[in-house]
Amino acid sequence: MGFKKMFKKKDPTESEIRESMQDAGLLVKTDVNGYNRNKFDAYKNYAAQVTQKSSAAPPAARSNPYAVQNQQPSGGNPYAAAAAGGASGSPYGGSDPYSNGGGGNGGSNSNGGSNSNGGSNGSPYKMNNGGNNAAPPPATNSPYSMPQNGAPPKESPAKSSKFKRFGRSKKEEAPPPLEDPRLRPRQYVAPTDYNDAERDDYEPVYDVGLPEEPELPPPPMPGAVNPYASANQGYGSRFGNVDRELEEDKTALFGPRDDPPMDSSYNPALSEQPKYAESVMSMPRQELSQKVRQKEPPAAPAPQTAAVAEYSEATVAVDEEEDLLLGGGSTLNLGRVDSYSYGNEQEYGKQNYTYNYNQGHEFDTVLEEEEKTEQEQEDEDVEAVKQQIRFTKQQSAASTRNALRHAAEAEESGRNTLGMLGSQGERLYNIHSTLALATTQHKIAEDKAKELKTVTRSMFAPHVSNPFNSKRRAQEKEDRIRRERAVAQVEREQRRRDAYDSQQRVVGALDGVGEKSKHRKEMMSKYGSRPGRDRYQFEADEEDDILEDEIDNNLDELSNAAGRLKKLGLAMNEEVEQQNEKLDQIAEQTDDLDISVHLNTARLAGIH
């Protein structure tokens, strides 16, 4: 057994196989001095790292932002903080300026409510009947707690409050921090009696609890307007005095008048106006005119010219005559408010008419104020438009920034994808070269199998070559080797050309856009100059120019980024198509090689 191992032929090494193939004139794969011909190994490593992270990293556990750990027992309120946050257990710990000083131990409050169960009642709307079967309420502080069993208020240490500083004992020390009253066991304490002697050392406690009920407004006076009056009252009593409201409106519009306001309250003496109007209407025209002229004219407020005085006297006489004809009612003078100012009507028929010559000036003043108001409104509208334009420009600048950020992210993702496609193309080239080498070695194996079949024939059928065609056989062998060598060179050059084209596509797309687009040149020639852009600006101030420059630059960068993204997309499309064709060729050659290897294996199996 040892002699057999000693004389057994050893398997050739890889270098020996490569040397034998080179001696035979076959192409072999060489790696001179460790030369790395792969240009996109960095992207290959990046893809491997991404794949490893995505497959090895465990899924991130979702955290519950509403969970509060180590603060409440199971089933508690997750929003409640620890008891150290405040004496009352509030998550916003600190003094409550609206608290009534009721603590969790004593359960007292400044409103006189106290609990006999060792803690204040849990619900402000529930009263304890003092029975034995009544369940004690939870020990929580409530400023609205009700007194139980008639117990008087009882002071107890509580959290600090600016309203409670007058109710603390002089000898009382600062209370220790309280625990959560809900976690304390319930206590049942008998009601205690109130003793004045025990409270001598306490200062008076000021009631700072709930505010007292507001006092009702005093009843309306007999002459006042009652908005809740019954429907059987008069129109004027239920809806106010029309004359007074009109006078108030005119005072607000034209300013206060010099003379006292008109008293248009209800006068029982005026209830007989229709009868008086009938008596006046029955008078003859001449007698009525004489009666009006016999009345003394009212004293003029200021000296006037003769013409104005005569006109005023005649006008007043005619107006009084019309009033007498129409019945003399005070409500009939409402139409003359724009021309006359009324005096105080103490008795019927004694109106003090005075012509207001400043009415025109007041009207002009009102018009000027209205024009000024309209101008201010227009200015406000213009300012609002300016603010809207400025806000829109700021939004546009922010939108361009976001678009640039997303474009940069998309470009980075596209570059990584294209780089990984380049690395994939290099690996396809290596696969194709290795497949071509396997095909060549398979041809050598076929030749060796034929030679082995010839050598292993029977000793009674020796193999003798024909000496007459030896030269022809040698020539055919040389032609076959030359032809195989030429085909191998063509295939090798084709593979190299495909690999170079793939590499140039990827590198050209990764280098970016070298020249500015034609559209960019047109826009720069049209709107690039400042004077040309000012025509489309509302207010070309410094801030607006800065915003416009930023928007223009961002749009230029977006245009360049869009061009680069387009080039990346086209390069990826073409690269994927070429790689698909290469994969089809590799699949076809692999199938042919598999069939040839299977056939050669069958031939070797037939050799005995």
Curated annotation (Swiss-Prot):
SMART domains: t_SNARE (SM00397). InterPro entries: T_SNARE_dom. Gene3D superfamilies: 1.20.5.110. Residues 390-452, 545-607 form the t-SNARE coiled-coil homology domain. Residues 1-23, 50-307, 514-533 are annotated as: Disordered. Residues 198-215 have a biased composition (Acidic residues). GO terms for molecular function: SNAP receptor activity; syntaxin binding. Signal peptide: none annotated. GO terms for biological process: exocytosis; protein transport; vesicle fusion. The keyword rRNA-binding does not apply. Residues 54-67, 74-85, 122-134 have a biased composition (Low complexity). Keywords: Coiled coil, Protein transport, Repeat, Transport. Residues 100-121 have a biased composition (Gly residues). Belongs to the SNAP-25 family. This is Protein transport protein SEC9. It comes from Yarrowia lipolytica (strain CLIB 122 / E 150) (Yeast).
